């Protein structure tokens, strides 16, 4: 893919860059057609620190909080992370395979990391998200849809049901769909019926 004013080798020019070592090449025939939305905060429910960035760059002090012992040794990443105030950071080039989906399947295809771009929102899956996060998310998703052949946007809960619950009931799917102007077919069945916020 050629570079554009907004994209340089899969790096989005409106995101702060903090490179993660946790990535690999996508399979040669993979088509980047899925956006997966997640939420995360470390420790859970606490916002504003740098623990998520440290996790994604393998620099988290496992002894800094009791919760961290339960995730000790994890090597994970996401392409993007949106803070509560809307700040956007990128950890992995979208042309590469980030490690965000885990064991997953969506619409007949397994291993969603192969064809997905992962976006983490700072938050927990039983609360709502900040308006500034939605503003950043809409802008980012619009740019991704223009750049890559995206046909699907789903939550971690949809690609790993029973194992994951994020971004959760507090995420406003109708808001995202309306702001992007995409058809219902882009989204998981049922999420656009009503806002659960």
What are these regions (language model features)?
Residues 88, 116-121:
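Internal catalytic-core helix/loop-beta-alpha segment
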Residues 1-110:
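N-terminal catalytic cores of peptidoglycan-degrading enzymes
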Residues 83-84, 104, 121, 163, ...:
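Short, functionally important structural connectors and interaction interfaces within domains
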Residues 2-13, 110-116, 124-197:
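Basic/polar, cationic surfaces and motifs that engage anionic cell-wall
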Residues 39-40, 121, 157:
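Residues immediately flanking
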Residues 37, 119, 137:
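Conserved, mostly hydrophobic/aromatic
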């Amino acid at each position: 893919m050629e570079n554009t004013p907004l994209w340089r080798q899969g790096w989005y020019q409106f995101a702060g860059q903090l490179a993660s070592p946790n990535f690999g090449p996508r399979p040669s025939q993979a088509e980047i057609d899925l956006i997966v939305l997640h939420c995360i905060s470390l420790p859970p429910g606490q916002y504003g620190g740098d623990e998520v960035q440290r996790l994604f760059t393998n620099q988290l002090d496992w002894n800094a909080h009791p919760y961290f012992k339960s995730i000790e040794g994890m090597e994970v990443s996401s392409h993007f992370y949106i803070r509560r105030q809307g700040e956007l950071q990128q950890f992995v080039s979208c042309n590469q395979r980030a490690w965000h989906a885990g064991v997953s399947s969506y619409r007949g295809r397994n291993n969603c990391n192969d064809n997905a771009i992962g976006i983490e929102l700072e938050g927990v899956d039983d609360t709502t998200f900040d308006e500034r996060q939605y503003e950043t998310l809409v802008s980012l998703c619009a740019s991704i849809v223009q750049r890559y052949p995206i046909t699907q946007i789903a939550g971690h809960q949809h690609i790993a049901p029973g194992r994951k619950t994020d971004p959760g009931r507090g995420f406003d799917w109708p808001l995202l769909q309306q702001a992007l102007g995409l058809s219902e077919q882009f989204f998981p069945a049922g999420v656009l019926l009503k806002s659960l916020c």
